[in-house]
């Protein structure tokens, strides 16, 4: 309930006039914040959310009122990828999924699909490394630490340009952490930047 009661915070923002507002949000907090920002006339192209704060569920109901709002992401929206087209053709259209036809291509659907790709790749790597058909949790962890979703493999899977390469290791479970920025155009999310690497030399010592 409290996440939907933001008026006083946005009145403070209107008074102090910051150059940018960054939102680490989730759930009902996101559309409420975007709505309040628009109501107080804060420029939405100066309002950016983290990757929890930039899905279709956060902006669709607001439509053009949310136009300009920014969010980070690590998977691209849309269905213009062979892998997504195959999911639609072989899974969604034949009725083998509870997903509605309009869901593939949206932020959360594509992100969940890529999560499934990572797990499937980890299992495959684990099977190859251990020689087992039925792998254990420890085996899959080994697979995750040796996963290699480089540009060539992403292209082979039908996901060229979909996300940053994912190269697993014990030392780096974040895989570098690169993201890009997407923007709501009033009806859909559009990717507006290339991949942006984190400033680990600045952040990690903190």
Where do the language-model regions lie?
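Segments of small-molecule ligand-sensing domains
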Residues: 96-109, 120-191
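Extracellular/periplasmic Venus flytrap/periplasmic-binding protein
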Residues: 1-40, 78-85
């Amino acid at each position: 309930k409290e996440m939907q009661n933001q008026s006083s915070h946005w009145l403070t923002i209107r008074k102090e006039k910051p150059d940018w507002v960054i939102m680490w949000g989730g759930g009902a907090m996101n559309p409420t914040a975007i709505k309040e920002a628009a109501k107080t006339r804060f420029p939405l192209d100066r309002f950016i959310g983290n990757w929890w704060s930039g899905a279709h569920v956060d902006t669709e109901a607001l439509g053009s009122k949310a136009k300009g709002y920014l969010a980070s992401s690590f998977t691209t929206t849309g269905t213009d990828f062979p892998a997504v087209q195959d999911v639609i053709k072989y899974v969604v259209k034949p009725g083998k999924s509870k997903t509605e036809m309009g869901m593939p291509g949206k932020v959360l659907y594509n992100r969940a699909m890529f999560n499934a790709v990572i797990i499937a790749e980890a299992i495959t790597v684990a099977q190859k490394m251990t020689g087992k058909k039925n792998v254990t949790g420890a085996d899959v962890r080994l697979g995750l630490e040796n996963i290699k979703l480089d540009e060539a493999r992403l292209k082979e899977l039908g996901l060229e340009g979909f996300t940053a390469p994912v190269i697993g290791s014990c030392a780096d479970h974040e895989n570098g952490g690169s993201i890009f920025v997407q923007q709501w155009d009033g009806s859909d999310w559009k990717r507006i930047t290339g991949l942006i690497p984190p400033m680990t030399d600045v952040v990690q010592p903190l």
